[in-house]
Amino acid sequence: MPLQSLTRAYQPTKFKHLISVLLVVVLSSTSCAQKKRPIKGETEFQRELNASYKDASTSPLKKKDLKNFDGLDFFKFDSTYVVTANFKRTPNEKPFKMKTTTDRLPEYVKYGELTFDLKGETFTLNIYQNQGLIKTEGYENYLFLPFLDETNGLESYGGGRYIDVRIPESDMMVIDFNSAYNPYCAYNDKYSCPIVPRMNYLKTRVEAGVKFFGKH
């Protein structure tokens, strides 16, 4: 209830009681403000991801990890890992069942191929579309880019990482590896996560995005 409404609710004879009530409200608000810590993150992506993981209603973290969660570990933002890729659509591909960490087999289709240069080398990654997700409003243009690299099992999660992108209007696509995130399985084994196809292995170190969370 707004403080102005509280003031109107009490009669003059109860003025002292009102002051006490308002004092409690103010002190409580001050206490909460002091306890609330700012969301960590060098970029907007990092701050949004940390905020999502800090929120019990959206976080994949186990209760014991959420209790002391202060933010994910990220590689330092590096513009080297923001690349422009040639986007080749593959409209004749047939849907397939993608393997996951459980017996769940979601239906995907290879939507295209992305070819780009990174640190003086040329790489190609397949990009996919979830055939169930495109039926959800707001995700009609959603594409899924899973990848493996040589930091996996060291600084980053052993099962690889994911990047979310939208279908571009042109035949070019910007890939920001700084926005690479871990599958939920990296935090909690109760989740079912797509296994990164082996053909999406990058034989280089991608020192960008979310790092390994810890032992689970």
Residue ranges of each PLM-predicted region?
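A mature extracytoplasmic/lumenal domain signature
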Residues: 87, 127-131, 149-151, 177-181, ...
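Start-of-domain marker
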Residues: 35-93
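Extended, aromatic/histidine-rich regions of cofactor-dependent oxidoreductases associated
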Residues: 36-39, 181-216
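Mid-length scaffold segments of soluble, non-membrane domains
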Residues: 94-158
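Acidic, glycine-rich flexible loop segments
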Residues: 144-181
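Terminal leader/tail segments of proteins
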Residues: 79-81, 93-99, 168, 216
